[in-house]
């Protein structure tokens, strides 16, 4: 009994579902997050279930749009809009004009839903900006600032016809930035110094990170070395992870402290003394839920999200929000001595799925898993865990 249950969970697939208000058109998606791998973007794949009698010769069109909101909705007056919408894809889904082979997920879903189900695929352009949401404050109203993606399928005579809400389905999706470490990447570092008037010698600060690319949830370690060749005294040290946000449309720049520590260990650093210490910080979105303006990796209503990933493919005419991160080390020397600051840039991103090498243990395990899936699908129906956008529920073919 136990092995049978384990096989049952192996073949279970989570599916997102949403139905039009009139119940005549339903859209199924296998996932809502689509990755940008740098050289290519994952396509938006799903299945459409439509009542043919309701169509009456009309067609089903689909579109993927991105909305860049750079101002608050409550400030939009007299026809002034602080948003810009771009159509990334607009195609006829039914009857389809493409001759593409459906994916395994689409085939399984079509077999389950029957002859009224039709697969569809939309390709996202490589230069499309990633999803970013600026976290709203407790008093903010309206839609949050940032870059949002939406998939919409609707019934109409032509693609130029304005969709009606009663026979259209809109689903929020996200475009995430994936990255993988480069073997040629160098350790980021910075070396700064400060001289003082009416005083000989300089204060020197060197900051080095253990690597350039970090994934969400990783700890960031900074090796700080302070050499005091001046006559001043370092009284306090502060290390922080700072998120830099650039809103390209309005040329706005924002700086938010994500994580910080303040230490007096090893202080005061008197003239002629040195200090070398490693400081570790953990930048997480969960620790900044109350901070207004923190950039996140898009925000879906169903769950939490990460901090916004670093913008890896930024160009001079980029439309969207450019994100970067720095480790900032600040030395305090009192009111007269002032401060010494060093910034070291690093990248924060989602890990790119690791491809399976043929012949490896992972490859053999996946092949065995696929073999068991095929065998089980022949012996019993495959279960689908369907998550409705309006409410969550589960159903199985065995109970239908």
Swiss-Prot record:
Keywords: Phosphoprotein, Sensory transduction, Vision
Record PTM text: Phosphorylated.
Signal peptide segment: none
UniProt xrefs under Gene3D superfamilies: 2.60.40.640, 2.60.40.840
Alphabetized SUPFAM superfamilies for the sequence: E set domains (SSF81296)
Pfam families per the UniProt record, alphabetical: Arrestin_C, Arrestin_N
Alphabetized InterPro entries for the sequence: Arrestin, Arrestin-like_C, Arrestin-like_N, Arrestin_C-like, Arrestin_CS, Arrestin_N, Ig_E-set
GO molecular function: G protein-coupled receptor binding
Regions that span the bilayer: none
Domain of life: Eukaryota
GO BP: G protein-coupled receptor internalization; signal transduction; visual perception
GO cellular component, one term: cytoplasm
Family: Belongs to the arrestin family.
Function: Plays an important role in the photoreceptor transduction.
Protein name: Arrestin, lateral eye
Protein source organism: Limulus polyphemus (Atlantic horseshoe crab)
UniProt lineage: Eukaryota, Metazoa, Ecdysozoa, Arthropoda, Chelicerata
């Amino acid at each position: 009994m136990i092995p049978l249950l384990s096989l049952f969970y192996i073949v279970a697939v989570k599916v997102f579902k949403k139905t039009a208000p009139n119940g005549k058109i339903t859209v199924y998606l296998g996932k809502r997050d689509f990755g940008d791998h740098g050289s290519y973007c994952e396509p938006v794949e799903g299945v459409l279930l439509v009542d043919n009698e309701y169509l009456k010769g009309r067609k089903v069109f689909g579109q993927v749009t991105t909305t860049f909101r750079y101002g608050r909705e409550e400030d939009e007056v007299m026809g002034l809009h602080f948003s810009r919408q771009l159509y990334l894809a607009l195609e006829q889904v039914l009857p389809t004009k493409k001759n593409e082979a459906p994916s395994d997920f689409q085939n399984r879903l079509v077999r389950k839903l029957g002859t009224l189900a039709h697969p569809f695929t939309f390709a996202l352009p490589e230069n499309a900006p990633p999803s970013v949401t600026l976290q709203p404050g407790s008093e903010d109203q309206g839609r949050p600032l940032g870059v949002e993606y939406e998939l919409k399928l609707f019934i109409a005579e032509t693609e130029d016809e304005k969709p009606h809400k009663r026979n259209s389905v809109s689903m929020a999706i996200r475009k995430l930035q994936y990255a993988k470490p480069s073997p040629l990447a160098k350790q980021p570092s910075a070396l700064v110094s400060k001289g003082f008037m009416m005083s000989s010698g300089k204060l020197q600060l060197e900051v080095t990170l253990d690597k350039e690319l970090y994934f969400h949830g990783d700890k960031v370690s900074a090796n700080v070395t302070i050499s005091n060749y001046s006559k001043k005294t370092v009284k306090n040290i502060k290390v922080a992870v700072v998120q830099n946000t650039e809103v390209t449309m309005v040329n706005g720049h924002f700086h938010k402290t994500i994580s910080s520590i303040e230490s007096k260990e090893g202080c005061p650093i008197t003239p002629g003394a040195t200090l070398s210490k490693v400081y570790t910080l953990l930048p997480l979105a969960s620790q900044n839920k109350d901070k207004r303006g923190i950039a996140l990796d898009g925000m879906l209503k169903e769950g939490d999200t990460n901090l916004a990933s670093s913008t890896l493919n930024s160009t001079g005419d980029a439309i969207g929000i450019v994100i970067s991160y720095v480790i900032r080390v600040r030395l305090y020397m009192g009111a007269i001595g002032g401060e010494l600051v060093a910034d070291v840039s690093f990248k924060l991103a989602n890990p790119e799925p690791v491809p399976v090498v043929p012949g490896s243990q992972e490859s053999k395990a996946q092949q065995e898993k696929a073999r068991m899936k095929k065998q089980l699908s022949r012996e019993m129906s495959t279960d689908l865990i369907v998550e409705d956008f309006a409410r969550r529920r589960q159903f199985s073919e065995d109970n239908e």
